[in-house]
From Swiss-Prot:
SMART domains: DnaJ. The gene is dnaJ. This is Chaperone protein DnaJ. PROSITE patterns: DNAJ_1 (PS00636), DNAJ_2 (PS50076), ZF_CR (PS51188). GO terms for cellular component: cytoplasm. Its main location: cytoplasm. Zn(2+) 2 binds at residues 186, 189, 212, 215. It comes from Chlorobaculum parvum (strain DSM 263 / NCIMB 8327). It is found in: Cytoplasm. The lineage of its organism: Bacteria, Pseudomonadati, Chlorobiota, Chlorobiia, Chlorobiales. InterPro entries: DnaJ, DnaJ_C, DnaJ_domain, DnaJ_domain_CS, HSP40/DnaJ_pept-bd, HSP_DnaJ_Cys-rich_dom, HSP_DnaJ_Cys-rich_dom_sf, J_dom_sf.
């Protein structure tokens, strides 16, 4: 996910142009490739600063970015075209940058902090000559949402219907950004969305291919902007989506719904909707892969003599037989009562962990019975040396009848 442009430059959202320019100059000098040879991290930071400044130094792009985020400037920003011709893979010599910072260069090209290079085309930019066709509009951004599910829903799979807020196509202009619904071919780049910019440095001349500054890299311009969407072709709206979640998903898994993300400005293709799964904690069961675990407390007499109990599952109750002589922490398995496998082909199991129930308060009669039971030499763990004829469970059966 792209970082916030204000965060990249280290300025507030209310920063004026001078503050933005100063912040950019500082970063450009610090991370310039000439100063950091073979340093990929510095190169990426330099590109980030270029991209951020290209947007925030332009009033129209900054307004669109403040309103729509990266989606509003996606095409021009993503092109890598830096201010004053420093994007697109070419970098000015750092000595020239320093000279311009200290006032040694001639200011031209709309106030770029790196302006001052002599452009061989005379006007700063020339048309791309229609080298290639441009796709319509800017691609919409992906939208991420979180979906909380119960263990019961995860076990069987579920269909969810949700209302989500996202950028939708403007109904007033049908997404064109134009009142009349029409756009015109950009006269600067002749529809290619790109221009060539040539500059001279102390090491010679270099040429960059950058996004057209007139159309933002789209190849089309809007003359009569729609007043409802300010010429963007998209607005904030609310839509209803259906999400089919298969059985067996886990916390952190995600589903991608192609084309259901934010609409693209001015007819651009929509982004994707990314649904991140969050599993709600369950008050009875613990999950272990596709198996689930349930803790069952059973009284001591039932552990000794055996019993049948009702056990909850994810889809109702079942009868479980606790065999006589079951030891604490024994796991009893109920097959197929776990969570459906994500790839199909059955379900996990339910494991019942049996523990002994110890009451905090007992009646006088119960105390007398326990005292009588305690007298038995076979009720304590070291009874084996005293009597080998009957086991502890056989003795307990005799006492409890």
């Amino acid at each position: 996910m792209k970082r916030d442009y204000y965060e990249i430059l280290g300025v507030s959202r209310s920063a004026d142009k001078d503050e933005i320019k100063k912040a950019y100059r500082k970063l450009a000098l610090k991370y310039h490739p000439d100063k950091n040879p073979d340093n990929k991290e510095a190169e990426e930071k330099f590109k980030e600063a270029n991209e951020a400044y290209e947007v925030l130094s332009n009033d129209d792009k900054r307004r669109r970015y403040d309103q729509f985020g990266h989606a509003g400037v996606g095409s021009s920003a993503a092109s890598g075209g830096g201010p004053g011709g420093f994007g697109g893979g070419g970098y000015a010599d750092i000595n020239d940058i320093f000279e311009m910072f200290t006032g040694g260069g001639r200011a031209r090209g709309g106030g770029s902090p790196f302006s001052g290079f002599e452009d061989i085309f005379g006007g700063g930019f020339s048309g791309g000559g229609g080298r290639r066709a441009r796709s319509t509009g800017i691609h919409g951004t992906d939208l991420k949402i979180r979906l909380k599910l119960t263990l019961e829903e995860i076990a069987k799979g579920v269909e969810k219907t949700l209302k989500i807020k996202k950028q939708v196509v403007c109904s007033e202009c049908n997404g064109t950004g134009s009142k009349s619904g029409k756009t015109e071919t950009c006269q600067t780049c002749h529809g290619s969305g790109e221009v060539r910019q040539a500059s001279k440095t102390m090491f010679g001349q270099f040429v960059n291919i950058v996004a057209c500054p007139t159309c933002g890299g789209e190849g089309q311009v809007v003359k009569d902007r729609c007043t409802s969407c300010y010429g963007e072709g998209i607005k904030q709206g609310e839509v209803t989506v259906k999400i089919n979640v298969p059985a067996g998903v886990q916390d952190g898994n995600y589903l991608t719904l192609q084309g259901q993300g934010n609409a693209g400005p001015r007819g651009g293709a929509p982004g994707d909707l990314i649904v991140i799964i969050e599993e709600k904690p369950h008050d009875q069961f613990k999950r272990n892969g596709d198996d689930i675990i349930y803790d069952l407390a059973v009284g001591f007499p039932d552990l000794v003599l055996g019993t049948k109990v009702d056990v909850p599952t994810l889809d109702g109750h079942v009868k479980l037989t606790v065999p006589a002589g079951t030891q604490p922490n024994t796991m009893l398995r109920i097959g197929g009562k776990g969570i459906g496998h994500l790839k199909g082909g059955g379900s996990g199991d339910l494991y019942v962990r049996v523990n002994v129930f110890v009451p905090k308060d007992v009646s006088g009669k119960d105390k007398e019975m326990l005292k009588e039971l305690k007298k038995s030499s076979h009720i304590s763990p070291n009874h084996g040396e005293q009597d080998h004829e009957k086991s502890i469970f056989e003795k307990a059966k005799d006492i409890f009848g």
